[in-house]
Amino acid sequence: EIMLAHRIQQGLLLQKALTCGLEIAEQAAELGITVADVLVCCGGGGLTSGIALALEQDAPNMRVRPVEPEGFDDVCRSLISGKIERNPTTLGSLCDAIVTLSPGQLTFPIMQRLCHAGITVNEEKALHAVQLAHDRLKITVEPGGAVALAAALFHGDQITSDCLIAVASGGNVDRDVFERA
């Protein structure tokens, strides 16, 4: 029964993420962008797979790329192996909001079908992205929600499109962590 509740939660998050994907497609179309790498912070895959589903229909040339913290890259490894991989623990990361033991049972098949290679970033880069988001973009984002921005800023060598969209999510950052950034 716990697993059933977890699957329901994944489904609800996936539905909410569809809205984000639709907004990305709409704004990209307004700007004339038809091809882009779309970097999405990824834990269990609800946000990532929901965005991928929306873009599949409305912007099929967008390349959704999950982004995870180094050492907690279960989705990236799962996409490479073709089967669900597990992290040994969920403890020990500043990006705790997106750290999961494994991709979701509902979300992994969607990501497997629709997502491109994932990217991992270290915590130092995630913290730097938190700081830059605050200082330059005037938004507060937690480290886990800043990993996509960190990938955009510091892993340009892994970006394959001329256009780039990075999803920043979650503003629940502890004062101590924010001050470290």
Located regions from the model:
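PLP-dependent amino-acid enzyme catalytic core
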Residues: 1-181
